[in-house]
């Protein structure tokens, strides 16, 4: 198990933290993200207990350079983000090598702090990514 603290700030309000937890719970139903077991609520933060994925992120495992990420990894990331977008209406835009972990040949997505439900206009980078342009999002570099 792993415990993550989500502090409430001017930028990350309690409502935003609620959304982050909700979206990760949805992704975990597909086994795309660590399962959340417990959320402890405090006036200034949440303490979230979840499954621990005991491996390095893709950037540390392979490189920060998207060209060094194996195609099988890109294929899994594309499948994860497509399902979250098309079935659940989730726009996950923080697409960097630091927010994906590979364990036992399976890719997991972490950090839903910048994820959101889709709006009338899809995020420009997610649109390109879902169309097959496999790069890391420069807005989060």
Residue ranges and their predicted role:
Residues 28-32:
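Flexible N-lobe loop architecture of eukaryotic-like protein kinase catalytic domains
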Residues 1-21, 25:
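ATP-binding glycine-rich loop module of kinase domains
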Residues 87-97, 102:
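Catalytic-loop of the protein kinase fold
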Residues 80-87:
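Conserved hydrophobic alpha-helix
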Residues 35-73:
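Conserved structural core of kinase catalytic domains
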Residues 90, 103-141:
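C-lobe/activation-segment region of protein kinase-like
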Residues 54, 97, 114:
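Short, glycine/acidic-enriched loop or turn micro-motifs at the edges of active sites
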């Amino acid at each position: 198990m792993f415990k993550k603290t989500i502090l409430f700030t001017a930028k990350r309000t309690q409502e935003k933290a609620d959304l982050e937890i909700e979206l990760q719970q949805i992704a975990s139903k597909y086994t795309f993200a660590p399962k959340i077991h417990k959320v402890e609520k405090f006036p200034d933060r949440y303490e979230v207990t979840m499954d621990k994925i005991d491996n390095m992120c893709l950037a540390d495992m392979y490189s920060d350079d998207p060209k060094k990420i194996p195609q099988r990894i890109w294929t899994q990331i594309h499948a994860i983000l497509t399902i979250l977008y098309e079935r659940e209406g989730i726009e996950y835009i923080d697409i960097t090598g630091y927010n994906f972990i590979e364990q036992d040949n399976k890719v997991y997505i972490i950090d839903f702090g910048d994820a959101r439900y889709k709006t009338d206009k899809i995020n420009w980078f997610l649109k390109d990514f879902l169309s097959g342009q496999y790069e890391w999002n420069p807005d989060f570099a």
